[in-house]
């Protein structure tokens, strides 16, 4: 009872602080994840144009560029780009067909590789791009029929089951993890993704009659059905995590689990939680170290949000917890939440030291019906850039400090910077660079307002101030690796 009382007091105390010190709490940390999900299923966020000609292809690409430009302008640093939906993909795969949303035809060729394009455009803007992959659901009967012979239900029928008029990969089949890893391997080997992000790595809701009894009898080995199912999901994730780290150890492996792990000691999940309802042992995954990040889908408010966010934080095992915020509820047709609901949640996330937040979904950051959320982020919460949180459990050694920073002030008012390259302890991990600017010397790199560019690839950068009176006098450059380790600065001479 004392523990319950203490938890309640902590939540109440924190919420009181939020109301009194909201301006202070919105002070921006140098490192946090600022993510947006870009949903390609049904073209919800992108694309809205079908690529059936050279002109329409460029229009389709321009739609994504416009979205990325707006997210970059708001200092987002992470894009969760949906690269696999329901047994079809948005990249050139040898295993599954191209999604029809691109051209109007199953496995149609849009004339470019959407995932490669998304990665390239994100990196141009200093943002990470994670390949968001729906894992087990394969779609309803109509969708599967449309894929025809290219559907996994035809190419690997023994891995698939039908349940409530939908098809799923069977997590209880021992070869399912290998099939999923074959898809992940394509993505990680062929593309310069910063992460792979797994969605729907769970059983369907109310899955008591899910048709896996044969596999359970064969492989249950005395475990309860519930525990066997949890172990199946854990084994899939364990296998993928280990294999990804063999290929590119810096690639982040994450999931988007159900937003509440279990009932807390005081607050009920009302039957909808990861552990019991859909068999996700997420805290077990964190404890075992087979997750770098989790993005729990915390599309709730009040006591359905705050105590469960604390629960994730307290069980994180040093891994990154980035709550997913249901910003779509701000829309009048979705829930018409008031903007201060999301504002309180973001303040709470910073006050409690979580690792950032993700916004579901990108279109609701673009529309005006979300009650000014985008402007709020630009003006108060994401005014300055933020670096990615580091991953010391993978690598804690910073690159060497770049040297020889040369500053050339040009007649057009721009400043051209160049420097000598840094070196990293991992020869496959070429360092990137962060550029800082200030009107005082030496430049204080602990202050996020001094960041003018991050994840710069190459050893040159041209700085142009937006406003003439914003022109900075002094510059510094650091090297940063893909684990988030940052070197000491190379300061430009005053």
Task: Locate each region found by the language model.
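Active-site clefts of carbohydrate-active enzymes
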Residues: 38-40, 251-271, 308-344
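Polysaccharide-binding and catalytic clefts of secreted carbohydrate-active enzymes
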Residues: 67, 76-77, 84, 125, ...
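Substrate-binding cleft of secreted/luminal carbohydrate-active enzymes
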Residues: 282-305, 319-393
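Pro/Thr/Ser/Gly-rich low-complexity, intrinsically disordered linker/stalk tracts
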Residues: 372-428, 484-494
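Solvent-exposed loop/turn segments flanking beta-strands in beta-repeat/beta-sandwich domains
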Residues: 422-448, 472
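Beta-strand-rich modules
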Residues: 463-486
């Amino acid at each position: 009872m004392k523990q319950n009382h203490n938890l309640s007091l902590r939540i109440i105390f924190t919420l009181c602080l939020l109301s009194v010190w909201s301006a202070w709490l919105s002070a921006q940390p140098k490192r946090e994840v600022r993510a947006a999900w870009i949903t390609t299923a049904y073209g919800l966020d992108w694309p809205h144009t079908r690529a059936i000609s050279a002109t329409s292809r460029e229009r389709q690409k321009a739609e994504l560029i416009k979205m990325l430009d707006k997210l970059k302008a708001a200092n987002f640093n992470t894009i969760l780009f949906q690269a696999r939906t329901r047994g079809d993909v948005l990249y050139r795969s040898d295993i599954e067909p191209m999604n029809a949303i691109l051209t109007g035809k199953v496995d149609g060729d849009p004339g470019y590789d959407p995932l490669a394009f998304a990665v390239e455009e994100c990196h141009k803007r200093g943002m990470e791009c994670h390949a968001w992959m729906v894992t087990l659901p394969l779609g309803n009967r109509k969708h599967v029929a449309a894929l025809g012979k290219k559907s996994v239900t035809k190419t690997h029928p023994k891995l698939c089951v039908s349940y409530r008029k939908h098809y799923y990969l069977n997590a209880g089949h021992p070869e399912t993890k290998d099939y999923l890893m074959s898809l992940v391997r394509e993505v990680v080997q062929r593309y310069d993704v910063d992460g792979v992000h797994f969605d729907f790595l769970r059983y369907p809701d109310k899955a008591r009659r899910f048709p896996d009894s044969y596999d359970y009898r064969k492989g249950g080995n005395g475990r309860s059905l519930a525990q066997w199912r949890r172990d199946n999901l854990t084994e899939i994730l364990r296998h993928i995590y280990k294999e990804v780290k063999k290929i590119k150890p810096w690639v982040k492996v994450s999931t988007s689990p159900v937003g509440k792990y279990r009932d807390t000691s005081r607050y009920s999940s009302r039957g909808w939680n990861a552990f019991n309802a859909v068999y996700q042992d997420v805290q077990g995954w964190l404890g075992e170290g087979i997750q770098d990040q989790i993005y729990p889908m915390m599309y709730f408010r009040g006591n359905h949000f705050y105590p469960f966010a604390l629960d994730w934080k307290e069980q994180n095992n040093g891994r990154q917890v980035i709550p997913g915020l249901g910003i779509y509820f701000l829309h009048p047709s979705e829930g018409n939440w008031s903007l201060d609901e999301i504002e309180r949640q973001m303040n709470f996330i910073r006050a409690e030291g979580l690792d950032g937040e993700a916004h579901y979904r990108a279109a609701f950051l673009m529309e005006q019906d979300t009650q000014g959320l985008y402007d709020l982020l630009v003006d108060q919460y994401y005014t300055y850039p933020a670096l990615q949180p580091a991953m010391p459990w993978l690598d804690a050694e910073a690159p060497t400090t770049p040297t020889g920073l040369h500053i050339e002030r040009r007649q057009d008012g721009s400043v051209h910077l160049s420097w000598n390259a840094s070196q990293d302890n991992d020869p496959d991990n070429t360092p990137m660079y962060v550029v800082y600017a200030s009107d005082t010397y030496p430049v204080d790199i602990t202050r996020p307002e001094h960041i003018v560019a991050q994840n710069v690839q190459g050893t040159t950068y041209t700085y142009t101030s937006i406003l003439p009176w914003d022109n900075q006098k002094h510059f510094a450059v650091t090297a940063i690796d893909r684990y988030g380790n940052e070197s000491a600065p190379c300061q430009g001479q005053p």
